[in-house]
């Protein structure tokens, strides 16, 4: 991650000048300010909001920054963030959550997250999905929770939807049910495809054609349960 010194070196100015550009830009000449701002953009520098530390103080615990995309809407998603915090504390780490919503500017939220200088990142979402990863996140150790990266090779911790559905349908068929109603998440959800694979595997192992069952796909959230 770029430092204040990197910006100063690229702009060919002093550290004080960079500091003034960030905190008191009106005190600089327009051409100097423009040069510093260009260097900040080129180095992807993010100001350090946690820099006010007493010199010589004991090292503070390491910190995990949790970037939470649409994960404050259900008990399941809240449980994810609470579990992260509890596990971090068990190992002597701190954690903080930065919420991001679909209409937010990702670059702005990521810059705010990184300005707190976390030692690592957990990117979590509500509902299993594939996500694009802002390049700045990959300047730190980063893992994904309940989501997968579209392009980058990043460790992901996700539910085993295929195996879970397989076990559930297998148990149902073992009780003698041969015509269960199959209620699915919306067809375009990533978890839907994997759960359908588990269902089909369990049915075929039991000699049952899954295509003969009645399948209904949710269209607009929980309201579809009432329709059925």
Give the predicted meaning of each segment.
Residues 41-42, 49, 83-94, 137-144, ...:
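Bacterial carbohydrate/catabolite-sensing allosteric modules
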Residues 1-15:
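Extreme N-terminal segment that seeds HTH/winged-HTH DNA-binding domains in transcriptional regulators
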Residues 66, 117-125, 181-184:
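Periplasmic-binding protein-like
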Residues 36:
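Short conserved active-site loop signatures built around small residues
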Residues 1-2, 41-75, 91:
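N-terminal helix-turn-helix/winged-helix DNA-binding helices
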Residues 105-119, 224-228:
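Short, well-structured alpha-helical segments in soluble
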């Amino acid at each position: 991650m770029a430092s204040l010194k990197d910006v100063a070196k690229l702009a060919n100015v002093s550290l004080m000048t960079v500091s003034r550009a960030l905190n008191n830009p009106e005190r600089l000449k327009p051409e100097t300010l423009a040069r510093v701002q260009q260097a900040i953009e080129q180095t992807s520098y993010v100001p350090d909001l946690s820099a006010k530390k007493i010199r010589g103080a004991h090292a503070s615990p390491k910190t995990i920054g949790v970037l939470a995309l649409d994960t404050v809407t259900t008990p399941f998603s809240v449980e994810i963030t609470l579990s992260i915090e509890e596990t971090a504390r068990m190992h002597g780490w701190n954690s903080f959550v930065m919420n991001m919503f679909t209409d937010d500017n990702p670059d702005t939220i990521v810059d705010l997250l990184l300005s707190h200088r976390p030692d690592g990142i957990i990117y979590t979402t509500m509902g299993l999905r594939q996500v694009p990863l802002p390049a700045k996140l990959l300047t730190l150790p980063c893992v994904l929770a309940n989501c997968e990266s579209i392009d980058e090779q990043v460790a992901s911790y996700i539910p085993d939807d295929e195996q879970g559905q397989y076990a559930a349908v297998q148990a149902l068929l073992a009780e003698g049910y041969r015509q269960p109603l199959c209620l699915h998440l919306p067809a375009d959800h990533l978890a839907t495809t994997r759960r359908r694979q588990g269902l089909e595997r369990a049915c075929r192992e039991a000699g049952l054609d899954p295509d003969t069952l009645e399948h209904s796909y949710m269209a607009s959230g929980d309201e579809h349960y009432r329709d059925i």
